[in-house]
Amino acid sequence: MAARWAQFLLFSLLSLPQVYCEYGMVHVLSEKGSSKGKDYCILFNSQWAHLPHDLGKASLLQLQDQTASVLCSPSDVPDGGFNNRIPMVMRGNCTFYEKVRLAQINGARGLLIVSRERLVPPGGNRSQYEEIDIPVALLSYSDMLDIVKSFGRSVKGAMYAPNEPVLDYNMVIIFVMAVGTVAIGGYWAGSRDVKERYMKHKRDDGAEKHEDETVDVTPIMICVFVVMCCSMLVLLYFFYDHLVYVIIGIFCLAASIGLYSCLSPFVRRFPLGKCRIPDNNLPYFHKRPQVRILLLAVFCISVSVVWGVFRNEDQWAWVLQDALGIAFCLYMLKTIRLPTFKGCTLLLLVLFVYDVFFVFITPFLTKTGESIMVEVAAGPSDSATHEKLPMVLKVPRLNSSPLALCDRPFSLLGFGDILVPGLLVAYCHRFDIQVQSSRVYFVACTIAYGIGLLVTFVALALMQMGQPALLYLVPCTLITSFSVALWRKELAMFWTGSGFAKDLPQPPLVIASVNCPQLPKDSNVPASQQETEEMANPTLHVKELHSPTLAAEEPADNDTKTEQSEVSIAQSEEAAGHNKDDLESKSLNLEQKQLE
């Protein structure tokens, strides 16, 4: 139960949009001109001031080493100020705004803040951005030491932000991962739904124990979910440094469960490790699970722990994060079930409004002028932990660029942009199977999701800023699903989910006929009377089948007559039962073949 609530809490954070850090370069060379220049990575915020894209257009200015101070008070300013120079000062003790304001007042043309910790974008509020007109950037402490070692203390530098390709090749990888996860998860959810009904009909309890329970989402649950989204987002906004580790821990737990759920069907097919552990009284282990299942559980937990320990290793940790994220999304898609298109529409539209409000409306409500959503997704600039929320697929940029010197800029896609439309795709596949529509809803909705994602990438290229993907995915998937149902004249059934049955459809009841031999007709008795007697006394036919002489002895053998009648009726019911089972089996086999 605790794990279920943890997953629900994590799901409430999945629609957070992501932002991109702004990387630039500082080109450093000796004032004497005796050595070749060298580029170093910097992290800046273009809201303070823009940097030129071409090195030839950047001003080459003297770098003044002031790393002995933090530039938080006028006493930290040297005599003569920073006239037309770029001071290098240490990070800490005051805000970025206080540092850059002192530098600008004293004639600086830019500011480099040296950080011993991980680089974060230097942030401020809207009024502070309007007041400052010189660029400010963060430089790592190791790069500062390399500058002093390579060029001495008399150096010049030029800050610039080289252009990058509008779209990177990594977008193809993100597209394949996202669409593939939605398609596989939706298909799996529909197939699993049919299998559950099949197992329930057969009353095969042993087989059902291996399956995870599904959760049918109701309108009340959707309302609770939205309230949790809003509450958790506001709590993260005010208590980010404390709650971010809780979210990371929940992600590790949920991702390990998702990975186990995805791999267990394959592990159960292996012929090895079927033996069970000995009898014991330990919790869970008293059920004597198979050795191979225990090994799988240990493996899944180990993968999550490894990611949790090395999550900030940009060279390879993103591969583990993507694998765990895809497994988690597949698990959620096959576990959470929306029973009606009405519920799907409600969920998608509510989250659509949720995104719009927290991205575009909250900047007018906060003191800093920043949206709550962006502030939480990017991590507050004054965060002491500098941790990032992990609910994203991330792929490093693949195009060659001078910015490859930096900490590998990533392209990101939130799990919510996969799960929320994916629940609609899963509903479409289950509806396809129920109405036997050759998966037209499933295919159309999956294609619509892919088109919506492509539109998101185009908007990203045109606006050169991170996009809330649900802004494009929700209209594409909802309109497409609605149009298909309208075209097939199944809108009422699709809207209410009335095509679904709690159990498998029952075949029509067929009563087997009882073959009775005809009595020899008496010419002296009217035909209508003979037919009436035959219908009223079918047992007589059974008796005459055994011996013609029994007809004359009928009054003396009433007990035998009753006995024979019961046998005849029992045989009739048995034949009808066999026919019913045959029809049910044919119906089940038809659904299984349709899935295959």
Swiss-Prot record:
TM segment ranges: 171-191, 220-240, 243-263, 290-310, 316-336, 345-365, 409-429, 442-462, 467-487
Main location: membrane
Signal sequence bounds: 1-21
GO cellular component: cytoplasmic side of endoplasmic reticulum membrane; endosome membrane; Golgi membrane; Golgi-associated vesicle membrane; lumenal side of endoplasmic reticulum membrane; lysosomal membrane; plasma membrane
Active site annotation, chain numbering: 355, 417
GO molecular function: aspartic endopeptidase activity, intramembrane cleaving; protein homodimerization activity
Membrane-related topology note: Multi-pass membrane protein
Gene3D superfamilies, per database record: 3.50.30.30
Motif PAL: where in chain: 468-470
Lumenal compartment residues: 22-170, 241-242, 311-315, 366-408, 463-466
SMART domains: PSN (SM00730)
GO biological process: membrane protein ectodomain proteolysis; membrane protein intracellular domain proteolysis; membrane protein proteolysis; regulation of immune response
Basic and acidic residues composition bias: residue spans: 575-585
Location relative to the cell: Cell membrane; Golgi apparatus membrane; Lysosome membrane; Endosome membrane
Similarity comment: family membership: Belongs to the peptidase A22B family.
Domain comment (free text): The PAL motif is required for normal active site conformation. The catalytic domains embedded in the membrane are in the opposite orientation to that of the presenilin protein family; therefore, it is predicted to cleave type II-oriented substrate peptides like the prototypic protease SPP.
Name of this protein: Signal peptide peptidase-like 2B
